[in-house]
Amino acid sequence: MKTVTAFRIQIYSGSRNGSTNAKNKFSKLFPNTLIETSYEQPYFKTKVSAFRTRLEAQKSLRLYKVSFRSAFIYEEKITIDKL
């Protein structure tokens, strides 16, 4: 599959329980939004959405930061079917 650079928002990094709690809270606040958890030793990371441009990501980041103050945007290579 083809990969592209996308802009993602990370809402949590820490313990497995904390990641699960963040995922559940986010799902209730923003249903039908892409949400994934990954493990990068020693942290579980909860990531949401996938945007083509940083500007698109910034618009959503403002909303997400109300409930997830440590949320931030980062670039990631993803498969094109996630966009």
Locations of regions flagged by a protein language model:
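Acidic/polar low-complexity segments and flexible, solvent-exposed patches
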Residues: 1-83
